[in-house]
């Protein structure tokens, strides 16, 4: 069944300006550190994301080391985005972060250029 978000999803959520950027962020964001890895039930995570969006949450926080295993939360969110939220992509803010050890060796830590390019 195709997902259709709540028509009144923006009526109850409070939104605040982010500095002087003009960007509006919801008062509540959803971080995907827990409950979105390969060890978790995909459909449960999908339901959480969809319900959050129905309630006006437009900011989803990820990182390339979220899982377990590392990266699996981003993969799962990508599937949810593709199948459920793609028509609403312009309404979403998706953030990530850098600086964590991703792989052994001198280029896999602390946000090196090589590490950041591997994410893109």
Where are these regions (language model features)?
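Glycine/proline-rich, positively charged
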Residues: 103-120
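Substrate-binding cleft and catalytic face of glycoside hydrolase catalytic domains
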Residues: 95-103
């Amino acid at each position: 069944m195709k997902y259709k978000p709540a028509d009144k999803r923006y009526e109850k959520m409070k939104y605040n300006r982010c500095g002087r950027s003009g960007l509006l962020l919801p008062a509540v964001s959803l971080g995907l550190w827990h409950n979105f890895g390969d060890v978790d039930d995909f459909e449960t995570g999908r339901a959480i994301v969809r319900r959050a969006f129905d309630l006006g949450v437009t900011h989803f926080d990820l990182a390339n080391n979220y899982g377990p295993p590392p990266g699996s939360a981003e993969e799962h969110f990508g599937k949810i985005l593709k199948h459920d939220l793609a028509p609403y992509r312009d309404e979403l803010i998706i953030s990530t972060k850098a600086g964590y050890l991703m792989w052994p060796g001198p280029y896999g830590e602390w946000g090196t250029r090589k590490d950041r390019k591997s994410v893109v």
